[in-house]
């Protein structure tokens, strides 16, 4: 028998999940904002720490004019787009990487009793706005990079830049959820998951031309991180694709994001079906 609380249409289910996430996240935000000084100091500290990553890139360019043939504003564009995608995904669904701890403590059993989608509840658990520092800082770098690259920004290119930020966020969000799903079977998979999310963002902040062709192929056809920024920015900046792929790949970020989201959703559902609870 179908669950009477479960909306029938996929669109209604999606709205229900978003509403559940929003309500749970708002609850955690109110709890944090009751300690305003601590909240503001933590947020400012997070913004400062994430800024150090870009400072490292700037220091590198004090010793060279080009990195793999890319200028500082071009590399800044790579940095900003990858950092925003990771930061936005971490803000929205990053709490899901603590699933292993929730399974061990029995907290997941409590979340499953709530009349709301389990994934929305896990993603919103202990939601914190201090993670807003990374996407905010990356937007500042993005604005600077766009300003330093005049003459490249037609309406089509600006539209492409906007969609790659959204697609990149979805791709990293899918990596968070897919990696968390593995924790249903392997509770210590968090570090492996981090190597793909945080490690992947670090990889993408540098030009693809400095990496081996095999690595670029691996993050294009294996783990599709190249669709976060390498491929679409190659089109915007007029850079050659190291793999010599058809031009259609440079526009395929939304398709890659949809496929990643679908795969992550299937992995989550499989893990949830396999979960038997702690008996607590």
What do these predicted regions represent?
Residues 2-280:
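Hydrophobic transmembrane alpha-helices and immediately adjacent juxtamembrane helices
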């Amino acid at each position: 028998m179908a669950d009477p609380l479960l909306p029938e249409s996929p669109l209604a289910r999606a709205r229900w999940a978003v509403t559940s996430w929003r309500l749970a996240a708002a609850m955690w935000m109110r709890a944090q904002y009751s300690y305003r000084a601590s909240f503001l100091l933590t947020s400012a500290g997070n913004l400062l720490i994430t800024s150090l990553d870009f400072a490292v890139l700037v220091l590198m360019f004090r010793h060279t004019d080009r990195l793999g043939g890319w200028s500082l504003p071009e590399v800044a564009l790579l940095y900003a787009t990858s950092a925003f995608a990771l930061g936005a995904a971490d803000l929205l669904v990053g709490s899901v990487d603590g699933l292993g701890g929730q399974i061990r403590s029995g907290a997941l059993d409590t979340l499953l009793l709530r009349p709301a989608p389990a994934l929305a509840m896990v993603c919103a658990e202990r939601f914190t706005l201090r993670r807003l520092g990374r996407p905010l800082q990356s937007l500042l770098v993005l604005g600077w990079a766009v300003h330093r690259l005049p003459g490249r920004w037609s309406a089509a290119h600006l539209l492409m830049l906007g969609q790659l930020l959204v697609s990149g966020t979805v791709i990293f969000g899918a990596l968070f959820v897919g990696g968390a799903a593995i924790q249903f079977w392997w509770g210590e998979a968090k570090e492996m998951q981090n190597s793909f999310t945080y490690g992947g963002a670090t990889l993408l902040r540098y030009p693809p031309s400095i990496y081996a062709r095999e690595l670029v192929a691996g993050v294009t056809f294996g783990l599709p991180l190249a669709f976060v920024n390498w491929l679409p920015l190659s089109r915007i900046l007029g850079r050659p694709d190291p793999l010599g792929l058809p031009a259609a790949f440079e526009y395929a970020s939304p398709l890659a994001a949809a496929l990643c989201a679908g795969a992550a959703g299937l992995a989550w559902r499989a893990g949830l079906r396999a979960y038997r609870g702690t008996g607590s």
